[in-house]
Amino acid sequence: MKYINYMNIKYWVAALVLSGGLFTACSDDLVVGQVDESGYTTGDGSVMGYISDGNGKRMFTNVEFRSSGDVSFHLKTTGKLSSEATVSVVYDETVLTEYNSKYGTTYEAFPESEVTLGDGGIIKLPVGSVHSSELKVSFVSDGSLEFDKIYIIPLRMKVTSGDFKLGEEDQTRLIFVKDLTGLPDCTKYVDGKPGVKVFSCMEVNDTNPLNNLSFTLKSNGKPLVDCLIIFSANINYNAETGRVYIFNNENVQALLDNREHYLKPLQDRGMKIILGLLGNHDRSGVANMSKETAQAFAQEVKALCDAYQLDGIFVDDEYSDYEYEDITPGFVYPGREPAARLCYEVKKAQPDRWVIAYAYSTTGSLPAIDGMQSGEFVDYALHDYGGSFDLSSSYPGMPKSNMGLYSQEFNLGSTASESNLRSMRENGYLSHMIFAMDPNRSNFEWIQMSAMERMARAFYDDELVFDGIKYPKDWN
């Protein structure tokens, strides 16, 4: 990241024509994101209602499950009602048909026969309350679904009683579902609940990602690492065509081209594969695309993720030479709003994949876009090294469990204490990033290994096991 000298880039990204992709979000967050109700108004003074899932999300709901799973929904209103309010929820495949037609996607419906709507599909809001009890949507595996494919549970919501209105975006809901029955589960559970997710951000110019397989927990054999971030692809600008595009150096491209060898073994153990996106010393970057440019770039991101079966992106606003005057068409003055716009457009283009932000520079805090809080379209926010403050005001609507605290930089020996890591976990912050882990480096035994042993104890009350395998960089 900001301490790494990035190599010169030499190769264009390959043409991306494949389709498909891997699902990426988790339904097991422990702390519900808070929704800012101030933006939900009708303009005529009447009460507005909105539907959120158990993580406080209104925009998209993503879930992975094994054998069976469920998602809860709540009705909230901007004011108390004088009579009981009800909303009916039904499985309606036309919702998916409309979505596929609008966005040019080809998602398939999750079998209706395997979906159960609790309470007869009725959400009830008692008189004098602004928050309903939960409606649970449950689903089971029938053995027919492909594990590497996303399916949709399409729902339609309708007000059946009560003096309030549902916004248009709250009248339908797509649940993006991935059936992982029979596949390894990378999630580490502590006291029956999902524990900390470890994000391993690797500068792959000299490090083999297979090293993430070498570290497991003694009690269950699960990998210490939950997610690999490939650092990094680049955001570049072609002055002749006026196009912003993704540019991979020879090392990133080698891993993508040989994903069966370097990346799929991690996914087979349950890990996610995320591609970093970073500026590259020209006028383009995370924080200065116009709406139209961001929308076009988001489609390129989707094509790349489809082609290489990636699980999402990691945005990092560094190394861009932004224009602050005489700004080129297609760009805007750099700032937090265009950075948020890029994240929003990428999430809209591929809602089943993660958008992760490095909470640094312009992405240290992101505003709402088109009425949606940044915690709706950014799945995880990972602090800069050592950062430990709550990110709720920086990413409104994001669950605490998706905020990464006390990030560590192993190359320079910037590590976290066991007490800080344990405090993080105990306070519900369940995401953590390590950068530049590589057992082939000279500081492995006395810095990296010790740091990961502290992580195993603090996060999981467990012991770290190193299998002794050190994978070298073995591609040209």
Residue ranges and their predicted role:
Residues 21-25:
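C-terminal motif of bacterial Sec signal peptides marking the signal peptidase cleavage site
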Residues 27-85, 93-114, 118, 124-138, ...:
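Secreted glycan hydrolases and related glycan-binding modules that recognize and/or cleave
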